[in-house]
């Protein structure tokens, strides 16, 4: 199965980039089928490369995947095609950029019914930055609602290509796939071969194998990698022995060596995927390269949330589950924390909201751990009056207001593509979320691209859902981090009968604090069950109460046994009840149901 090294001119390394749900993984299936890497009977289910249940269900690709195919072209030669399937979601854009760096070309897929969307443009820019040759492909042309010529015009405006350079296919029906294969062979250049240089290989993904440790997927940029070589990872500066190297078809195929230009895998008994970071460079220990490949960066989590087991006995199960998940996901970070209201749990850092949802769902589905999640928030920079600077990712550790000199929060630059009819709605949403409007450009007569700058905290919550609902599903968004800015933020505490519930604390902008406090108290009033005594729900900034709701006590009719009789007897019974309730209120703890934490997540509903 392996290729002789002399045939590097017949290698094509390419990836497929697209907005979510534009048919990327289905197209990958057709390519596997036409190259006979798999036949239909082996496929079983659609989307072969999306091998997590969650990936298939949500119709998204979460991890990057790599697979090698052999194709007999019309010119009579056999070509080796290395397809790298990339995630399409904004949370995983760093993974996408590293996958692109392992390729020479890209197929840009655009849905014939939807047209160019925000992440199509974001991924296109990533591909152009990586210097890739791009083949634009319009997919789903078999659907009755497809508008091939309209979408082609959008692509021409966006990329400046000629009409005959745009391919039209239907991945599901298998239309136009042969023409696409020929285009891959003729329009994507072969890799540059530098076999005589010191080894430099780019890691674009890693997965954890319970028996073999971390399996590293890499692209050999320069030099040769042989089985048994001692290798060094630049980021961790650790040394390992290459126990097994090879190529990926549907299974791992061991090889004795991988030459420059090839894509393959490396197994070298790595116990932790954090030692094999995406974007890092692998070199030889005895003949190392002087510098790493450019583009590597430490992935920083953008969204933080507390995860607590519903049943406190499951804390160890949660720890083990997070450890196992982190083996496969180097971007997940977690540290233990305790909460007065929720007990022991973990503070977790995620790339974005989708990443957070996926981790939660995998914890519940694959590991059977039931969890309560606190409100997601971002990391703030707090400058204190004594000159110190602290990073706060949890509202409960926010310093007191008197010690704070200034607070900074992260901002993102966002582009929203929508139909022109919804500009007004989106401007209104932008203003509500403290957005700073920049510009609007027309893509064609009906579609516009709007540019905003937002505080990340306003976006991570439910912005995407709101955007979809006000634009009847037509708008799409993409954002990138642009740095920290000074902001007037305060910590809003929730108190039940004077006791602060730390897990309900949030950090909000001062202009929104009153509105949040009011909504939150009203929401909690409807959720917290009645007690035998009165419960006061208060929202406070520091010692100042800004909103209050009261849950009245459940009352037993203590006068039921008094038929007529002396009023003082009745008064005595009522006084006794009042005393009992007062005593109860002093010792009683209000149980906060799980719905109260979920209420924070959809406060506007």
Swiss-Prot record:
Gene this protein is translated from: lepA
Its EC number(s): 3.6.5.n1
InterPro entries, per database record: EF-4, EFG_III/V, EFG_V-like, EFTu-like_2, LepA_C_sf, LepA_CTD, LepA_IV, P-loop_NTPase
Cross-referenced PANTHER family: TRANSLATION FACTOR GUF1 HOMOLOG, CHLOROPLASTIC, TRANSLATION FACTOR GUF1-RELATED
Name of the protein in its database record: Elongation factor 4
Location of this chain's protein in the cell: Cell inner membrane
GO molecular function, one term: translation elongation factor activity
Membership in a protein family: Belongs to the TRAFAC class translation factor GTPase superfamily. Classic translation factor GTPase family. LepA subfamily.
UniProt keyword terms in alphabetical order: Cell inner membrane, Cell membrane, GTP-binding, Hydrolase, Membrane, Nucleotide-binding, Protein biosynthesis
Any Pfam family the entry gives: EFG_C
Coiled coil ranges: none
Catalysis: reaction(s): GTP + H2O = GDP + phosphate + H(+)
Any GO CC annotation of this UniProt entry: plasma membrane
Binding site for GTP: 21-26, 139-142
Topology relative to the membrane: Peripheral membrane protein
Domain tr-type G: 9-192
First-tier enzyme category under EC: hydrolase
UniProt keyword Ribonucleoprotein present: no
Any one GO biological process: positive regulation of translation
UniProt function note: Required for accurate and efficient protein synthesis under certain stress conditions. May act as a fidelity factor of the translation reaction, by catalyzing a one-codon backward translocation of tRNAs on improperly translocated ribosomes. Back-translocation proceeds from a post-translocation (POST) complex to a pre-translocation (PRE) complex, thus giving elongation factor G a second chance to translocate the tRNAs correctly. Binds to ribosomes in a GTP-dependent manner.
Protein biosynthesis keyword on record: yes
């Amino acid at each position: 199965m392996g290729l002789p090294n002399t045939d590097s001119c017949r290698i094509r390394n390419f990836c497929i980039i697209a907005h979510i749900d534009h048919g990327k993984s289905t197209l990958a299936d057709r390519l596997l089928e036409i190259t006979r890497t798999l036949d239909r009977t082996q496929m079983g289910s659609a989307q072969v490369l999306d091998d997590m249940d969650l990936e298939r269900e949500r119709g998204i690709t979460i991890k990057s995947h790599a697979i090698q195919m052999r194709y007999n072209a019309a010119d009579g030669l056999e070509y080796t095609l290395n397809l790298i399937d990339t995630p399409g979601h904004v949370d995983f854009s760093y993974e996408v950029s590293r996958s692109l760096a392992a390729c020479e070309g890209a197929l840009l897929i655009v849905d014939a019914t939807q047209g160019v969307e925000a992440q199509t443009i974001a991924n296109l820019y990533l591909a152009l930055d990586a210097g890739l040759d791009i083949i634009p492909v319009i997919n789903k042309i078999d659907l009755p609602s497809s508008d091939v010529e309209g979408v082609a015009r959008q692509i021409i405006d966006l990329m400046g290509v000629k009409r005959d350079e745009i391919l039209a296919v239907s991945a599901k029906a298998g239309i136009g796939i042969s023409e696409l294969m020929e285009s891959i062979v003729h329009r994507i250049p072969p890799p540059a071969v530098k076999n005589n240089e010191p080894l430099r290989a780019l890691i674009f993904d890693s997965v954890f194998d319970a028996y073999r440790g971390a399996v590293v997927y890499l692209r050999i940029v320069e030099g040769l990698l042989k089985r048994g070589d001692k290798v060094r990872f630049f980021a961790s500066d650790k040394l390992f022995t290459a126990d097994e190297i090879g190529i990926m078809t549907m299974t791992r195929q061991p090889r004795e060596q991988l030459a420059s230009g090839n894509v393959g895998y490396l197994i070298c008994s790595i116990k932790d995927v954090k030692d094999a970071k995406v974007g890092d460079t692998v070199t030889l220990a005895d003949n190392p390269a002087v510098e790493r490949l450019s583009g590597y960066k430490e992935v920083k989590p953008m969204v933080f949330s507390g995860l607590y087991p519903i049943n406190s006995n499951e804390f160890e199960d949660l720890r083990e589950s997070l450890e196992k998940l982190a083996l496969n996901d180097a971007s997940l970070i977690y540290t233990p924390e305790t909460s007065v209201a929720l007990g022991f749990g973990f503070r977790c850092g995620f790339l974005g909201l989708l990443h957070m949802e996926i981790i939660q769902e995998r914890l519940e589905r694959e590991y059977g751990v039931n969890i309560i999640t606190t409100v997601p928030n971002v990391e703030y920079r707090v400058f204190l009056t004594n000159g110190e600077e602290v990073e706060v990712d949890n509202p409960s550790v926010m310093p007191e207001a008197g010690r704070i000199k200034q607070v900074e929060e992260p901002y993102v630059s966002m582009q929203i593509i929508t139909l022109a009819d919804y500009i007004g709605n989106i401007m209104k949403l932008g203003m509500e979320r403290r957005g700073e409007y920049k510009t609007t450009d027309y893509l064609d007569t009906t579609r516009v691209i709007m540019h905003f700058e937002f505080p990340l905290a306003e976006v991570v919550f439910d912005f995407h859902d709101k955007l979809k609902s006000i634009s009847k599903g037509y708008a799409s968004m993409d954002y990138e981090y642009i740095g920290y800015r000074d902001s007037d933020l305060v910590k809003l505490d929730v108190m039940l009968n004077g006791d602060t519930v730390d897990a309900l604390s949030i950090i909000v902008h001062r202009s929104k604090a009153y509105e949040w406090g009011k909504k939150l108290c009203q929401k909690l009033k409807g959720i917290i069950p009645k007690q035998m005594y009165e419960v006061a729900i208060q929202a406070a900034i520091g010692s100042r109460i800004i909103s209050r709701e009261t849950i009245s006590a459940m009352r037993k009719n203590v006068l039921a046994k008094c038929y007529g009789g002396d009023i003082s007897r009745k008064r005595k019974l009522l006084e006794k009840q009042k005393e009992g309730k007062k005593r109860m209120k002093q010792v009683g703890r209000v149980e906060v149901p799980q719905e109260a934490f979920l209420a924070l997540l959809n406060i506007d509903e």
